[in-house]
């Protein structure tokens, strides 16, 4: 004979399972449907900065250039003060020409031309 307590326990477990299934399906459905391999960064070019383009357009350099990493040659490792097994090279999308402008009392740079060059944040000052 099945008691009422056993039946209630089964109903609670089924309810929790259905609720969990609902949340998982909802999360899967809200995830963007795209192929992650096609998310390559665009070519280095001027792009409209929507945050600062209120009364007039403000452009910033956006996009990718190239980067690569490879094993450091043994001869180079021996000459390093702090040996590193991996060497990396990178070029970033930076402004070739720009000028300062004010947007709501904030000084920003409006880029006029972009190119691939040394990444500033990799440089030692």
From Swiss-Prot:
Its main location: secreted. Keywords: Disulfide bond, Glycoprotein, Hormone, Secreted, Signal. It is found in: Secreted. Disulfide bonds join 41-64, 44-93, 61-114, 65-116, 92-119. GO terms for molecular function: follicle-stimulating hormone activity. It comes from the Eukaryota. The keyword Transmembrane does not apply. Heterodimer. Glycoprotein hormones are heterodimers composed of a common alpha chain described here and a unique beta chain which confers their biological specificity to the different hormones. Shared alpha chain of heterodimeric glycoprotein hormones. These hormones bind specific receptors on target cells that in turn activate downstream signaling pathways. Involved in gametogenesis and steroidogenesis. This is Glycoprotein hormones alpha chain. It comes from Fundulus heteroclitus (Killifish). The gene is cga.
